[in-house]
Swiss-Prot record:
HAMAP family cross-referenced by the UniProt entry: RemA
UniProt xrefs under Pfam families: RemA-like
Top-level division of the source organism's lineage: Bacteria
Coiled-coil region(s): none
NCBIfam families named among the record's database cross-references: MtxBflmRegRemA, PRK04323.1
UniProt family annotation: Belongs to the RemA family.
Protein name: Putative regulatory protein OB1501
Organism: Oceanobacillus iheyensis (strain DSM 14371 / CIP 107618 / JCM 11309 / KCTC 3954 / HTE831)
Length: 86
């Protein structure tokens, strides 16, 4: 198993193998997911007090908040996959 880490901003990283979804925090269902994760102590806030721009959902039901755009995080995952395929 190859460990690949994705930078989600401010020196924070998430394991690319554990990511299920990267979404925008604007919709009501995502806001509910964040609230439930906070209540269940499964929320990781990696925004450093900045505005949340991406919500990363992992296979362990953890929810990670990032101040980086979802498109940027997605591109980092894709480019990391291409590097690991070589």
């Amino acid at each position: 198993m190859n460990l690949s880490l994705i930078n989600i901003g401010f020196g924070n990283v998430v394991s690319a193998n554990r990511i299920i979804s990267i979404v925008s925090p604007e919709s009501a269902p995502i806001k509910r997911i964040i609230t439930v994760a906070r209540d269940n102590n499964k929320l990781v806030d990696a925004t450093y007090g900045r505005r949340t721009r991406a919500v990363i959902i992992t296979d362990s039901d953890h929810v990670v908040l990032s101040a980086v755009q979802p498109e940027t995080v997605g591109q980092r995952v894709i480019s990391n996959d291409e590097i690991s395929d070589e």
